[in-house]
Amino acid sequence: MKRILFVAILVAGMLFSADAMANKRAQARAEVLSRSRGFYKEVFMDGGIGLTSRHHLPATQFLGVEMEYFASESTKNLSQKDTLMQNRAFCGSKNDTNGWLLYPDGAPRFRMIYVNGGKARLHARALGDEGRARIQAYVAGGGSYLGTCAGAFIASEASLRARGVEGLTNADIYWRLWPGYAQSTRLLKSRTELNLPKKSALLRYYDFGGDRQVAQVRHNGGCLAHDGEFKSLAAGTEPLALYRYDNTEKVKIDGKIAVWGYKANEESGRVVLCGSHPESVGEGERLEFMSAMMLHAMDGNPAPKIKGVLNDGEVREMNKRTEDNDPAYTRIGDRQYHHFQIEIPRNCKKAVVKLDGYEGEKNFDLSLCAKRGELAFHDNTLLKSVSRGCKKSLTIEKPKAGKWFVSVFCETTVTSNTGKYGTYYRGRVSVLNGVPYKISVEYE
């Protein structure tokens, strides 16, 4: 009887532990997803020239996040219009001078970009130097990046082919988001198994059946993180999954790094690169694996930046354009927050924050909010003004002295539609170049 009781207690303890871990993972997923405030949407998918022109990404629906995308024609059907539409999305246009990925001040407009598989060299050449600069600015400014197969190759310094260092290619056109070589696996039209190390950050989000294995992941000419003969693994690279594969004379990838992450510094986004193709699967562990990579990438978004300190009685003019290269005073973009700090003195009877637009550009909706001790958002404070228009006044009666934060939010946004090339915008497209405003605080 005692033995039966002991076994029952042991089983109950194991079940409790499993439930606790499942809850912990669910909380980790929810925490990452809760930090989307101040971004236009979570995901932008690149299916541009040379890449798979995918119109759906199952993991976005699985996670419940919003996505927009660009999808070109197939390589054999490409035309000048594909280049025009791709440049409009990534490089900019009259109504959006720095492209969809970036706000007017250079902050990331999406939390993450996902780059599909396909032909990395063709895509890199099609986007050119300007497109590469936009992608680099996006990641450096805090936007995260996930690339599979070609999307992993193109994010590296160069690709390393079978001939060793003599086969080093594309160093002049790749995006250099990760300072290492993506080495060809030489494996085509096959399946691989991925093994997650015990310390893999992806295990924060799912347990993958408890064995840390993801089976039957499609692989077609993908890559691994080169570590050794020609260049050591870049400092800061985190192995997230390894290949499990019965090596042959031609293909020797067992135990090699199949998925890896990299974050250059505290202000940059996180880059996650995967040599295989889990992205099209709509169920099971491969879907969870793709979702985990997305979550880990988005977890690398840095904390929002403070634009500056508002001083008593001074009017701060936020009217610069992208071309002025002065982000601390640049206009606000659609669904973006601008954060400011104020120092309320002792014995202050009230603090009045005022917001207004500029003549000829007041037909936008800006809102205002404030909070003591932490950044203000619509959902964490009752001190807010959300009426139509730009002009606002927010009075804080008998405020406690100390550090407060004031935030401006641009309610006006574009109307997003889907067509032949993926997303296109209608409606208030002028908001993409930013809304100018003036903000001040006065103490009594």
Describe each region flagged by the PLM.
Residues S74-D105, R161-T169, G210-K231, K307-A328, ...:
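Surface-exposed intrinsically disordered loops and tails
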Residues A28-Y40, G47, R54, Q136, ...:
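Extracellular ligand-binding/catalytic regions of CAZymes and related secreted enzymes
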Residues L366-N433:
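Noncatalytic accessory or regulatory domains flanking protease catalytic cores in secreted, cell-surface
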Residues A140, A155-G209:
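Class I SAM-dependent methyltransferase SAM-binding "motif I" and its flanking Rossmann-like core
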Residues Y329-D379, P399-K403, Y443:
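Acidic, Ser/Thr/Pro-rich low-complexity intrinsically disordered segments
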Residues T52-G164:
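Helical hinge/lid and interdomain linker segments adjacent to catalytic or ligand-binding clefts
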Residues T192-E267, E279-G282:
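Catalytic beta-strand/loop cores that center a nucleophilic Ser/Cys/Thr
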Residues F6-F16:
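Hydrophobic helical h-region of N-terminal Sec-dependent signal peptides
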